[in-house]
Amino acid sequence: MAKQDLKKGELAEERLRLYFLNLGYFVVRSIKADFKGFDITDVDLFLYSRPSPISRERTNVDVKMKQRPQALERIFWTKGLQDVLGLEKCIVATTDKRSHVGEFGAKHNVLVLDGNFMGKLDSTERYSSDRLTEEELLDMIELYSVGELGGNWKKCYEQSKSNLLLKLNFDGVNHYLDMVKRVLEECSSGFTSQATIRMLYIYTSFFLIALDYSIKDYSYKDQPDRVRLISDGIRFGEKGKAKSLEIISMSTALLKSFMAKEEHDYGAIEHEVLSQFDSILSDDIAEYLGSTKQMQKLFSLAMNFEKHGYDRQLQSPL
């Protein structure tokens, strides 16, 4: 695929993405932050890092390459977005070179990458890469759309990116497992293309990041406890086993209040629902991922899968 010409802002985002990748961050570009189906804003770059076994850092980056960047206003906006999303850090990248912009940002715990920094980034080939841009990947997804993959490929991909902001928990873990399953089903049906393989790599990287964040507080626990917590997370979602059992009990009680007891075996209904949960094969994956050795590898594996997803020279696992 030939390299695609990008607009000034898109090019700046790509160069910053490469810059942060080289620093060891997991980076996702152009994420929609929405609420109940309504798009609120875009996060230009989302950074994820693993400073220690028990800490994680998530950062939203605002990139504005306009002649009149309104940098001070962007600092307010970006800091507010960080607080709303519950992230740990935020960064503003701007063409503004005035020193007081950086001072104002530092006062409010916002790192400012000013025009001097961005100019150096633009003038060097240091961070050039044989990677697809986000625009090229999206074009490829649309061009090679095969099968249904649960509907619109692009929509599924955009929602999966959004979940890194909104569902970086076991609900997100289960979403990414489902997306990996759908892509594998697509491949097994004979619909293998660059798009399917790249999506397999990228969804796997999202799954690993979501899992890494979800279990960050488990490192001090014994392995049997970690395995149980991961298994319950995959089986019952973020609310956990206790909350799920409570919902089942409440639902059964509600049915009893509206329907004659002699017409239905409510115990059998409750037992069947629990059986459906128990049928989810989460124990094996939890046993594997719950070991200290594998937990330490999640972030580096995610970085490698992300790289394979964007490499121009695609390596097929099939």
How does the language model describe each region?
Residues 95-153:
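Domain-level recognition of nuclease-like catalytic cores that cleave nucleotide substrates
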Residues 194-274:
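Extended alpha-helical coiled-coil/bundle linker/stalk regions that scaffold oligomerization
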Residues 1-35:
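Acidic-basic catalytic patches of nuclease active cores, encompassing PD-(D/E)XK
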Residues 20, 45-47, 57-65, 78:
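Conserved catalytic cores of phosphodiester-cleaving nucleases, focusing on short active-site segments
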Residues 63-116:
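Catalytic cores of nucleic-acid endonucleases
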Residues 149-225:
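Charge-patterned, long linear interaction tracts outside catalytic cores
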Residues 249-318:
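Charge-dense, extended regions
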